[in-house]
């Protein structure tokens, strides 16, 4: 059987942090099960999160009206992206599983990780309008977010002051990962880590390692398949008419983002369908 390969992308500056401990636990657990593990420790690498003309070697197609999405896509096709971007793309291409380990900052990913997404996941490499979502280039890869928060789980609940965690996760899990084709697994959520005692932290790490023993067998989260949509500009990339009619019978929407003005399916971005 072919060896599985994992890429762990860490976005935390401190080696004494719980995020670093989670990364180390993941490396240990996966290697123990025979995985090859590659890391991208973004702060340790001093990864540049800023998109710019420097991401492209050679002359741009239009230097007077430089459009990064156009120029970076062309540079990818012509092999003119900067070496640091190419190195990350090669890691991503080789990986079967990608784990993103980070603290939740302002209801999103840290800036350095956002920059990694913007610079590495260029058009042509990670997506096109013809190959996106379940038709995306990474449709045979699995991914998951491993996140720590400052607030408690109740703060991110339906009645919590921060609002539903499912809604917070949607832009990342659907708008970035699923958009590129990934099968998105249930997120690993560690709430209120700053107020978690040492013995409980050990239990969290052990539970994380236990999960990773069988992570490849996990079912992904549900996202509305592209077959439900008319995927062309003339139709506006909308749900097919017959799908819209069929969905009128259902109490719940399809997902967090495709709620259709109805109640959102419970834990759509946290738990896989049984």
From Swiss-Prot:
Outcome of mutating residue 219 to T: Has no effect on the catalytic efficiency toward menadione and nitrobenzene substrates
GO molecular function, one term: identical protein binding
Record has NADP as a keyword: yes
InterPro entries xref list: Flavodoxin_fold (IPR003680), Flavoprotein-like_sf (IPR029039), NAD(P)H_dehydrogenase_qn (IPR051545)
Organism: Rattus norvegicus (Rat)
Cofactor(s), names only, from the UniProt record: FAD
Keywords noted in UniProt: Acetylation, Cytoplasm, FAD, Flavoprotein, Isopeptide bond, NAD, NADP, Oxidoreductase, Phosphoprotein, Ubl conjugation
Miscellaneous: Quinone reductase accepts electrons from both NADH and NADPH with equal efficiency.
Cross-link Glycyl lysine isopeptide (Lys-Gly) (interchain with G-Cter in SUMO2) mapped to chain: 251
UniProt entry tagged with the keyword Calcium: no
Amino acids binding FAD: 12, 18-19, 67, 104-107, 148-151, 156, 201
Quaternary state and interactors: Homodimer. Interacts with PDLIM4 isoform 2; this interaction stabilizes PDLIM4 isoform 2 in response to oxidative stress and protects it from ubiquitin-independent degradation by the core 20S proteasome. Interacts with TP73 (via SAM domain); this interaction is NADH-dependent, stabilizes TP73 in response to oxidative stress and protects it from ubiquitin-independent degradation by the 20S proteasome. Interacts with TP53; this interaction is NADH-dependent, stabilizes TP53 in response to oxidative stress and protects it from ubiquitin-independent degradation by the 20S proteasome.
Region (Important for apoenzyme conformational stability): 225-274
Catalyzed reaction equations: a quinone + NADH + H(+) = a quinol + NAD(+); a quinone + NADPH + H(+) = a quinol + NADP(+); ubiquinone-10 + NADH + H(+) = ubiquinol-10 + NAD(+); menadione + NADH + H(+) = menadiol + NAD(+)
Effect the entry attributes to changing residue 239 to M: Has no effect on the catalytic efficiency toward menadione. Slightly decreases the catalytic efficiency toward nitrobenzene substrate
Enzyme's top EC category: oxidoreductase
Gene Ontology BP, a term: superoxide metabolic process
Membrane-spanning ranges: none
Binding site for substrate: 126-128
Entry-annotated residues carrying N-acetylalanine: 2
Family per similarity comment: Belongs to the NAD(P)H dehydrogenase (quinone) family.
Protein's recorded name: NAD(P)H dehydrogenase [quinone] 1
One Pfam entry name: Flavodoxin_2
